[in-house]
């Protein structure tokens, strides 16, 4: 599972997810990408499930880039615990994803295979997504 090696503070505030993604909204490394259309916390387990889905579909062809990393901890109290008694223990790690963020990119494969892999990965995520391609402006890739 993906998680930070070290963090300054183990427990974080929940925060708010408002607005669109400031960076990472374009396909930069590969030819095809999976873009988020809704805000969400994507867990390390969901990222790993998507990675497995894509790599199994590609079968050692092409290259995969994972452009999100779960660097935010979330906490949870044990079941049947009374309120109070401080913040719960760290349960796992999430990546905060805003609308417009390209989460996964694929390059070096045919279009049909890339779209098939990304569609399969999209079923592993709790949000609406769309498949995007690299934009070519004036004959050059952007």
Curated annotation (Swiss-Prot):
SUPFAM superfamilies: Ribosomal protein L16p/L10e. InterPro entries: Ribosomal_uL16, Ribosomal_uL16_bact-type, Ribosomal_uL16_CS, Ribosomal_uL16_dom, Ribosomal_uL16_sf. CDD domains: Ribosomal_L16_L10e (cd01433). It holds the Pfam family Ribosomal_L16. The keyword Ribonucleoprotein applies. GO terms for biological process: translation. One of its GO terms (cellular component) is cytosolic large ribosomal subunit. PROSITE patterns: RIBOSOMAL_L16_1 (PS00586). Keywords: Ribonucleoprotein, Ribosomal protein, RNA-binding, rRNA-binding, tRNA-binding. The keyword Chloroplast does not apply. GO terms for molecular function: rRNA binding; structural constituent of ribosome; tRNA binding. Belongs to the universal ribosomal protein uL16 family. PANTHER family: 50S/60S RIBOSOMAL PROTEIN L16, LARGE RIBOSOMAL SUBUNIT PROTEIN UL16M. Part of the 50S ribosomal subunit. HAMAP family: Ribosomal_uL16 (MF_01342). Binds 23S rRNA and is also seen to make contacts with the A and possibly P site tRNAs. This is Large ribosomal subunit protein uL16. It comes from Fervidobacterium nodosum (strain ATCC 35602 / DSM 5306 / Rt17-B1).
């Amino acid at each position: 599972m993906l998680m930070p090696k070290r963090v300054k503070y183990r427990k974080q505030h929940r925060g708010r997810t408002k607005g669109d993604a400031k960076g990472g909204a374009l396909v930069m490394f590969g030819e095809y990408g999976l873009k988020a259309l809704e805000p969400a916390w994507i867990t390390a387990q969901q990222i790993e499930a998507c990675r497995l889905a894509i790599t199994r579909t590609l079968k050692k062809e092409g290259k995969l880039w994972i452009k999100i990393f779960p660097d935010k901890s979330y906490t949870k109290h044990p079941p049947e615990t009374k309120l109070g008694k401080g913040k719960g223990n760290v349960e796992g790690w999430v990546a905060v994803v805003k609308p417009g963020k390209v989460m996964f990119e694929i390059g070096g494969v045919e279009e049909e295979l890339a779209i098939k892999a990304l569609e399969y990965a999209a079923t592993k995520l709790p949000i609406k997504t769309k498949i995007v391609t690299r934009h070519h402006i004036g004959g050059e890739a952007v």
